[in-house]
């Protein structure tokens, strides 16, 4: 394999890996998350509960309000990973993609017109999660 093909392969693994890990975390929040948990309760679990009651509410949120907890967690993880293992671009790429999971989630609740052609194309081709695929998640019990 050439260096470029190795990088492309790593990027694909990073995207699928980060997508899987954020999905596992979201599943964990739905099943085990409690509003009285330290930090996560107020800033993650409560927000998730509100989202399940009114899924479109998140579409009016700014990028920062959607992703700040993910970016704060990613920054902490980056500092720790650099401290213990040194700098690796793969870790940075994973944290960047993972930190934007809520933006991709927001797109599943928007119309094609709100998303624009590029995002709608990515959803239609399965490159990112489609509205239909995400819809089952909002059926009880969640």
Region locations from a protein language model:
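Hydrophobic transmembrane helical bundles of multi-pass organellar membrane proteins
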Residues: 1-142
